């Protein structure tokens, strides 16, 4: 069998050339990293859970008219996605203080934000993804002002959807990050949500207990990461059948 062409390999996902022009296959790995890759481990079943969870969130966004790169899930670890031109920015929405904003601004963890705050970070591992202003983004040509306005609008729509969804299953959406890409329909360019939405890219706290159900479990050595992600999947009704760790990757050619 012919091997698929590798397009890109990141810390948690691998992209392969898709079966049709303009498509890619996104493979979710079991690798867990923190501190820009300084802390690493392999968590059995993490890729399976993130594939299912990201599919669930992307489908839900599509159902309310938020465009995403998701086409369909192929198997337990892979999904077919649209190829996009990724804007080199991480878009972060914060509802509650946690993570870097606490140390940067001296805010106590758990403090509610007065309103959802949208931040931009330049995607560059060598620089540890520094926070940047809209002035930087426009001056360096990463995105135009209209793009930025559209990105903020997209991010806030994602926030409204995820916040309500999580609230319904007893989880607080503390913050999340997304990536946004450009696609062209003829001469018309539009922006869509890309990458993934999963507990790798969100902070999720149990509303009653404050238990962390996201990658902070790994960052802070708070317990079993797969257990936390499984709890999120169970509450949302998308828990895969059978023991997650026993599910092996299925390659397609």
UniProtKB/Swiss-Prot annotation:
It catalyses: 5-amino-1-(5-phospho-D-ribosyl)imidazole-4-carboxylate + L-aspartate + ATP = (2S)-2-[5-amino-1-(5-phospho-beta-D-ribosyl)imidazole-4-carboxamido]succinate + ADP + phosphate + 2 H(+). Its EC number is 6.3.2.6. The keyword Transmembrane helix does not apply. PROSITE patterns: SAICAR_SYNTHETASE_1, SAICAR_SYNTHETASE_2. Gene3D superfamilies: ATP-grasp fold, B domain, Phosphorylase Kinase, domain 1. CDD domains: SAICAR_synt_PurC. Pathway: Purine metabolism; IMP biosynthesis via de novo pathway; 5-amino-1-(5-phospho-D-ribosyl)imidazole-4-carboxamide from 5-amino-1-(5-phospho-D-ribosyl)imidazole-4-carboxylate: step 1/2. Keywords: ATP-binding, Ligase, Nucleotide-binding, Purine biosynthesis. It is an enzyme of class 6 (ligase). GO terms for molecular function: ATP binding; phosphoribosylaminoimidazolesuccinocarboxamide synthase activity. Belongs to the SAICAR synthetase family. HAMAP family: SAICAR_synth. This is Phosphoribosylaminoimidazole-succinocarboxamide synthase. It comes from Jannaschia sp. (strain CCS1).
């Amino acid at each position: 069998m012919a091997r698929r062409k590798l397009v890109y390999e990141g810390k948690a996902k691998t992209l392969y050339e898709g079966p049709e022009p303009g498509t890619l296959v996104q493979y979710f790995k079991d690798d867990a990293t923190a501190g820009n890759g300084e802390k690493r481990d392999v968590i059995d079943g993490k890729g399976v859970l993130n594939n299912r969870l990201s599919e669930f969130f992307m489908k839900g966004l599509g159902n309310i008219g938020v465009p995403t790169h998701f086409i369909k899930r192929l198997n337990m670890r892979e999904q077919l996605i649209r190829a996009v031109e990724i804007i080199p920015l991480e878009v972060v929405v914060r509802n509650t203080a946690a993570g870097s904003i606490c140390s940067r601004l001296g805010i106590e963890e758990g403090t509610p934000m007065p309103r959802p705050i949208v931040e931009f970070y330049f995607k560059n591992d060598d620089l540890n993804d520094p926070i940047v202003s809209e002035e930087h983004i426009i001056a360096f040509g990463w995105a135009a002002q209209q793009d930025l306005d559209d990105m903020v609008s997209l991010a806030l729509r994602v926030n409204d959807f995820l916040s309500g969804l999580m609230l319904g299953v007893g989880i607080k959406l503390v913050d999340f990050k997304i990536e946004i890409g450009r696609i062209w329909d003829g001469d018309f360019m539009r922006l869509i949500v890309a990458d993934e939405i999963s507990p790798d890219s969100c902070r999720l706290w149990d509303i009653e207990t404050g238990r962390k159900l996201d990658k902070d479990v790994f960052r802070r050595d708070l317990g079993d990461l797969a257990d936390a992600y499984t709890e999120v999947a169970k509450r949302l009704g998308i828990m895969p059948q059978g023991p997650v760790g026993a599910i092996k990757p299925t390659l397609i050619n």
